[in-house]
Amino acid sequence: MPGRAPLRTVPGALGAWLLGGLWAWTLCGLCSLGAVGAPRPCQAPQQWEGRQVMYQQSSGRNSRALLSYDGLNQRVRVLDERKALIPCKRLFEYILLYKDGVMFQIDQATKQCSKMTLTQPWDPLDIPQNSTFEDQYSIGGPQEQITVQEWSDRKSARSYETWIGIYTVKDCYPVQETFTINYSVILSTRFFDIQLGIKDPSVFTPPSTCQMAQLEKMSEDCSW
């Protein structure tokens, strides 16, 4: 998605985005401990809204967006944020409906709409149960620290990982997800300002202009 990364198998880019790009794209209570005291993946919240900053190696840019994540219904909405005036930069809204297998791209200014097929299956924004625990540490300084855990898809058969996820120990909120290929970062997404729940479920409903949507993705620059 214009938000999340490729599936944890790293592949073609959820550049269907999302969270484009999208798809870099979790939340519970204290991670439970196994019989030998080894940390276990926590359960991330399934419905929340927040903001994200996503870096894509292909473009060399950071993009900011508002994010609505509904894991229960397998849908995501990403709304590009304008933080500075960039000539010929178009802002879009992306609505990804995985149960229907479609993604809508809507121009925020004109409401022009594109409808595309989602070729990748739903990949929840969370810590897979077969993940490898890497580390636990604090972010910030005295009186302002947040304890997080770092997980990856590294296995004993190989020494490196292609996915790294950082989540808070308390409430299991996503902090950052990073995808790599051959030791190079291809996609990295940071999450912040998270609020539980979906304030307005209608954000997942495409506008009426999508009833006559074109079938090709719109360009992000001025080449209309």
Swiss-Prot record:
A Pfam family reported for this protein in Swiss-Prot or TrEMBL: Ependymin
Post-translational events: N-glycosylated; the glycan contains mannose-6-phosphate moieties.
Biological process, per Gene Ontology: cell-matrix adhesion; myofibroblast contraction
Family affiliation: Belongs to the ependymin family.
Tissue: Ubiquitous. Detected in brain, heart, skeletal muscle, kidney, testis, ovary and prostate.
Stored PROSITE patterns: EPENDYMIN_1, EPENDYMIN_2
Subunit comment: Homodimer.
Protein name: Mammalian ependymin-related protein 1
Domain of life of the native organism: Eukaryota
The keyword Glycoprotein appears for this protein: yes
MF terms in GO: calcium ion binding; ganglioside GM1 binding; identical protein binding; phospholipid binding
Primary residence: other
Signal peptide: 1-37
Keyword Secreted in annotation: yes
InterPro entries noted in UniProt: Ependymin, Ependymin_CS
Function (record text): Binds anionic lipids and gangliosides at acidic pH.
Membrane-traversing stretches: none
Gene Ontology CC: extracellular region; lysosomal lumen; lysosome
Entry keywords, A to Z: Disulfide bond, Glycoprotein, Lipid-binding, Lysosome, Secreted, Signal
